[in-house]
């Protein structure tokens, strides 16, 4: 006996929240599930999911921008007599100040076995794996204001007056294992159930970043086009948790109830002698 399902989704979640500049969020998913009765006492369930998220916005569209616009008055002019955007409206920053982009891929797989060797006795073994790949790029382009003579003046909007590029990539692996068993039995007016199991989770992540300033041309805001202040670095971290648990349930005539729980957990967050 088998059952399966699959679906594909593509959604343009947010095609812009601002009138100046461009911001957009796109999301794509692909899901599949399959289940099979391997035997009268064994079942297999498997699922896979892929998710892609693409996000783009002006690099100036941060908390500082929203903080500033909350202090503007409805009477503030939008353009000057020469037809240029007024500096206080921060429109040039949104339109010409650079772009922030983020691309995120997640691939998840889950596998579960269910065994029933005896009536009332179940054994479960579950495993999950999630792979995440993320790429973030940001470029900052200086902008200009114009004086009364319509002459351009370089403006520092809080991020300097030189071109800047930042690139960050990271990969994260997540693993989870759950193995547990339960047994329930009734005799007369007595009903009981016992549950025992263990849980293990682990994260591994590494990243690499680089930055630079002074682009050869603002039309190609890439790291390879920066000429000064070139920097790079990387990082790695991991953490893990493990737990053991048990539960005993008893009731008499479905009226008098008793439940006992036991759990022991450990985490790599703490020093070895205190985990």
Could you tell me what each predicted segment is?
Residues 1-4, 8:
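Single conserved hydrophobic/aromatic residue that forms the stacking wall/gate
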Residues 120:
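Active-site and adjacent substrate-binding regions of carbohydrate-active enzymes
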Residues 272-275:
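Short glycine/threonine-rich loop-to-helix capping motif typified by GTGT followed
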Residues 17-23, 29, 33-108, 124-242, ...:
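Surface-exposed loop/interface segments of Gram-negative outer-membrane beta-barrel transport/assembly proteins
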Residues 9-13, 258-270:
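Transmembrane beta-strand segments that form the barrel wall of outer-membrane beta-barrel proteins
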Residues 242-252:
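Structured alpha-helical segments in the cores of large, soluble enzyme domains
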Residues 32, 36-37, 113-117, 183-185, ...:
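Residue-level signature of outer-membrane beta-barrel architecture
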């Amino acid at each position: 006996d088998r059952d399966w399902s699959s679906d594909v989704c593509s959604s343009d979640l947010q095609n812009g929240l601002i009138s100046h500049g461009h911001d957009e969020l796109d999301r794509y998913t692909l899901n599949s599930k399959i289940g099979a009765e391997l035997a009268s006492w064994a079942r297999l369930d498997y699922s896979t999911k892929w998710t892609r998220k693409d996000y783009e916005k002006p690099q100036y569209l941060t908390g500082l921008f929203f903080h500033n616009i909350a202090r503007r008055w409805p009477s503030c002019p939008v353009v000057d007599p020469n037809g240029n955007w007024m500096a206080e409206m921060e429109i040039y920053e949104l339109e010409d100040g650079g772009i922030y982009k983020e691309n995120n891929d997640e691939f998840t797989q889950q596998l579960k076995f269910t065994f029933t060797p005896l009536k009332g006795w179940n054994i479960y073994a579950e495993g999950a794996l999630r792979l995440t790949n993320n790429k973030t790029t940001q470029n900052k382009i200086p902008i200009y204001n114009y004086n009364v003579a319509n002459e351009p003046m370089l403006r520092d909007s809080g991020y300097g007056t030189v071109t800047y590029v930042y690139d960050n990539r990271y990969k994260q692996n997540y693993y989870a294992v759950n193995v547990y068993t339960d047994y329930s039995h009734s005799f007369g007016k007595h009903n009981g159930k016992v549950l025992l199991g263990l849980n293990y989770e682990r994260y591994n992540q590494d990243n690499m970043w680089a930055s630079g300033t002074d682009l050869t041309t603002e039309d190609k805001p890439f790291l390879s086009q920066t000429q000064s202040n070139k920097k790079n670095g990387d990082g790695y971290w991991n953490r893990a948790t493990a737990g053991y648990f048990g539960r005993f349930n008893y009731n008499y005539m479905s009226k008098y109830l008793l439940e006992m729980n036991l759990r022991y957990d450990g985490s790599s967050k703490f020093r070895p002698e205190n985990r």
